[in-house]
Structure formats: structure tokens, C-alpha cells
Amino acid sequence: AGRGRATAAAGALAAPAILAQQPRAIRMGYVMGAGGAADKAAGDFARIVAERSKGALTVQNFPGGQLGGERDMVESVQLGSIQIGFFGSYLIGNIVPEWGQVLDTPYLIRSQDHFRKIVDGPLAKPMYDALLQRKGLRHVAWCNRGPRYLTTNRAVTTPADLRGMKLRVPELETYVAAWRSLGAVVTPMALPEVFLALKQGTIDGQENPLELIFTNSFFEAQKFVNLTGHIRSGYEVVVSERWFSGLPADQKTIVMEALVEMCRLEDKYQAEDESVLEQKLKAGGMTFHPVRLETFQSALADLPKQFERKWAPGFHDAVLKA
């Protein structure tokens, strides 16, 4: 009996060592389509992690909303069933709206450099602290994305052309309010549902960066890319704190450093792809149509007044002046 107890004890001691040898699977979800800049960079992340962890960590990527829209994925990352989320606008606009809605205000952000100055600097720290406290989502990095453009089946030059047009926008208050004030009939909808809605005529148009217009094949259902360039933003990478806190220190370092590298690679791919995407969309039958930007900017000039009571005091002005 004594020998049996000793064997059992030895087995119990060996168990953690055996468990440690099993590769940890990391699931990363995102709505950006397969083959785009974000997806290519996610593939690099998987390779970097496998190499640096010597196979102890493996990454499975789920592009194109395979794990649901961004609303669903926020919950999954919070619970730890998805370990890493690679998000567009939904996350900060809904979870930390006091800051996120400001960044989603049309024509507030002047350029990609302006955006990065805000989100990579001290102004954004309270936003990331709130993200962690409210939902257990740890901010890691931002990757670039192209400007958002409106796609439709008839050319749009000024807001007057939008009257009565049914537009899909993300599930974000500032987006909904902006397009309503421009005269459109707004339908918030998760991205994976948009292609079918366009094909069936449930909606007349949508707005997204060129990458998502291409990878979601919207050129099969839309004729015009109207060059509104109304939002300049990025993709945010967050990890589940519930999962991350349980990683050994060396694996935490590998994951964090590889995610930052992933975003720098994505920035490069995105810059390279932007002009290529324009050519591909034109080849797919789309016309790139200039708009009268000043008519959109002036029509939306009062939008911040609708929301400023909800926003973090002084944040809008600080972004404007940065």
C-alpha cells in the first residue's frame, strides 16, 4: 500500500510537467476577411509565436467573422473562450464610449498619423484602463486601417443624394447619428450579414475601408465607392485578461511582443495594399467617385453637440488640438 501511495504521489508531481508539454492553443478572432492585410499579419503572428515558444503555443486564426460579429466576440474574449480579439470600431465605441465615440466622430481625425498620436499616447491611457476594468480586456496595440468610404449603387456627391437611402452602419451611436443627420435611413448590422443584405436589396449601401469592401466582395453588389473618407481609425488588438493572467511570464512576453510586431507588419501590408485594392475594385466593376467633402463636413459640424455630455471631459478638444 505504501508503494501505491508513493507511485500516486510521484504521478501527481509529474502531472504538471506533462500538462506543460501540451501546446497551448490560442484562438484569435476578427471580422476582417481572409487574404487582407489584417489576416496576413495574423498569419505572421501565428508563425512568430510558434517559433519563439518552440511549439509550446499554437495560434488558430478565425477571419471573416467565423466566430461571430464584433459584439459576440467581445463577450467571447471577456470569457476567455477567444483569447485574442482583433477589433474594428465596435469595441471602444460601445465598451468605453466616453472616449471611443469621440474617435469615431466623422472628420475629427485628420490623418492616420493624427490617429496614432492619440491612441499611442497618454491621452488614451484612461480608455485602456476602463477597458480592462469593465470587461477584462487588456489593450495591446493598434494596427492601421484605410479611411472609410461609402459604397452605393448610385453616385453620391453631396448629402442631398443620400435622402431616403438605406445604409448599413456599425452598431455605434455616433455612426447612426451621423448618417441619419445626412438624410439616410440607417440600419445597424453586424458585418457578416452585410453582403446578403446588399444582394437582396434590404440595404442600398454601406461604408468601410477598401480592404473590407474587397475581402467581403461588396463589389459584386455595389457600383460606386464614394470618396467620403469620413473616418480614419485602426484595428485594436486586445487579449482576455482571464486567460492572459494565467500564462507563465515568458509566454506573456512572447505573446505581447509578437502582437506588437503583428501590427507593425499589418501597417506595412495596409499601406502597400491600398492602391492595389483600388485597382482590384475597379477591375471588379466599381467606379471611384469624388464627393464634395465640404458639404459633408459642414452637415456634420454640430454632431459633437449631441454627444459631448456623454464624453470624457476635455477629450474631444484635446483630440482636436493634438
Residue ranges and their predicted role:
Residues 117:
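Short beta-strand-centered segments that line the small-molecule binding cleft or hinge
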Residues 7-11, 16-114, 123-322:
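N-terminal secretory/targeting leader peptides
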